[in-house]
Amino acid sequence: MLQTQNLQFSYKGSKPLTFPDMHCGKGEQWLLLGQSGSGKTTLLHLLGGLLTPQYGSLKIGDTDITQLKTAALDKFRGQHIGIIFQTPHFVKALTVEENLILAQQLAGVKIDKALVFNILNQLNISHKLKSKPNELSVGEQQRVAIARALINNPSVILADEPTSALDDKNTDEVIQLLENQAAEVGATLLIVTHDGRLKNYFKNQIEIL
């Protein structure tokens, strides 16, 4: 489902970052572990189509996303890749419901308010449907970010440091939530983190040195 080969990326004035080849099957759950400065967030941005590698291939299903032009890549990302950023970003003027509908619109899929409600309900956050993002707690914002990542039934879910600021109890809850929701839609889950506690949760692991 998610395959990379010979990926390489460099920021201007910096030496190239090279990444290990990956092969993550459909529905598998993976941990990508690396310390700060290892390039793990850069890799997440490459996997999500937010950066373009200077070299290498990156396939989701049968599509090499490095070959897609901007508009096609944006549409493909919206329909097939769910990204949960370390710090959630929402359109502040819109409600929770409207932010999720916007994700549907940007992906070019049919607006489905019932689906929006159902996903929020699964995450125990449907009572905040009409709330603005700044009216939510940090934990509630994280759940809405997960809902937004799931709204278009993605093939791949990428989560950036979802537990870095959490205690053990909340870490366990968030990981179970991500695993359960990924399994619900049959998506490949890849968690990118420096949090060594997560080694105990995943049998499939990649470490970036």
Q: Which stretches of residues belong to each language-model region?
A:
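Conserved signature/switch motifs of ABC ATPase nucleotide-binding domains
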Residues: 78, 131-134, 152, 185
